[in-house]
């Protein structure tokens, strides 16, 4: 260890000689980067070959096979996913076709049911209308019979009323009562002329 003394230079002259000896042992030249010196090329080439050989061995035996497996797994996974997507798409298209077919069948059934219901309602309506018409015709015929009977009864009373009224008018005008037979024959003649 070198200790600087007071008044002495920090680096003794012997130290310069040692540095000079070190420089001479290193090739006697000052300066220059050792890897660029031609006398070191042989050892550097050997280490270069060893380093690249080890790197090549590690890359070819460890790293590249791993990368290859990873790429192959990714490729297989992508192919599997694409195949599964194709299957799902085919299933989806089949389901859509089945849905459309079922929808078409349901529409056809609904139209058939609606047609049957319309036909049934039309038949029921026709049957009800015919029944109602028959019922109304029967009531109308019965009413016409009653009207005819009432008319005949009323007309038979009209003759009697006409005979009584005519007799009363003749009595009021002439002052003496007319004979029943004369009044009845006059009323019958007037009724016969009116109905003809």
Curated annotation (Swiss-Prot):
It is found in: Cell inner membrane. One of its GO terms (cellular component) is plasma membrane. Keywords: ATP synthesis, Cell inner membrane, Cell membrane, CF(0), Hydrogen ion transport, Ion transport, Membrane, Transmembrane, Transmembrane helix, Transport. The chain crosses the membrane at residues 41-60. Its main location: membrane. Residues 1-18 have a biased composition (Low complexity). CDD domains: ATP-synt_Fo_b. Residues 1-33 are annotated as: Disordered. GO terms for molecular function: proton-transporting ATP synthase activity, rotational mechanism; proton-transporting ATPase activity, rotational mechanism. It is a single-pass membrane protein. InterPro entries: ATP_synth_b/b'su_bac/chlpt, ATP_synthase_B_chain. F(1)F(0) ATP synthase produces ATP from ADP in the presence of a proton or sodium gradient. F-type ATPases consist of two structural domains, F(1) containing the extramembraneous catalytic core and F(0) containing the membrane proton channel, linked together by a central stalk and a peripheral stalk. During catalysis, ATP synthesis in the catalytic domain of F(1) is coupled via a rotary mechanism of the central stalk subunits to proton translocation. F-type ATPases have 2 components, F(1) - the catalytic core - and F(0) - the membrane proton channel. F(1) has five subunits: alpha(3), beta(3), gamma(1), delta(1), epsilon(1). F(0) has three main subunits: a(1), b(2) and c(10-14). The alpha and beta chains form an alternating ring which encloses part of the gamma chain. F(1) is attached to F(0) by a central stalk formed by the gamma and epsilon chains, while a peripheral stalk is formed by the delta and b chains. HAMAP family: ATP_synth_b_bprime (MF_01398). This is ATP synthase subunit b 2. It comes from Azorhizobium caulinodans (strain ATCC 43989 / DSM 5975 / JCM 20966 / LMG 6465 / NBRC 14845 / NCIMB 13405 / ORS 571). The gene is atpF2.
């Amino acid at each position: 260890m070198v200790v600087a003394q007071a008044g002495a230079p920090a680096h003794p002259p012997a130290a310069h000689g040692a540095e000079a000896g070190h420089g001479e042992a290193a090739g006697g030249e000052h300066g220059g980067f050792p890897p660029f010196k031609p006398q070191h090329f042989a050892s550097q080439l050997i280490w270069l070959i060893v380093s690249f050989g080890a790197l090549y061995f590690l890359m070819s035996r460890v790293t590249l096979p791993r990368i290859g497996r990873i790429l192959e797994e990714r490729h297989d996974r992508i192919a599997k996913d694409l195949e599964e997507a194709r299957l799902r798409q085919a299933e989806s298209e089949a389901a859509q076709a089945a849905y459309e077919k079922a929808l078409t069948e349901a529409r056809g059934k609904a139209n058939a049911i609606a047609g049957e219901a319309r036909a049934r309602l039309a038949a029921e309506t026709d049957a009800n209308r015919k029944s109602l018409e028959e019922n109304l015709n029967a009531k109308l015929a019965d009413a016409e019979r009653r009207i005819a009977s009432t008319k005949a009864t009323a007309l038979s009373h009209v003759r009697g009323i006409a005979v009584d009224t005519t007799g009363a008018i003749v009595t009021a005008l002439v002052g003496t009562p007319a004979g029943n037979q004369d009044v009845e024959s006059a009323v019958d003649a007037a009724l016969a002329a009116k109905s003809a």
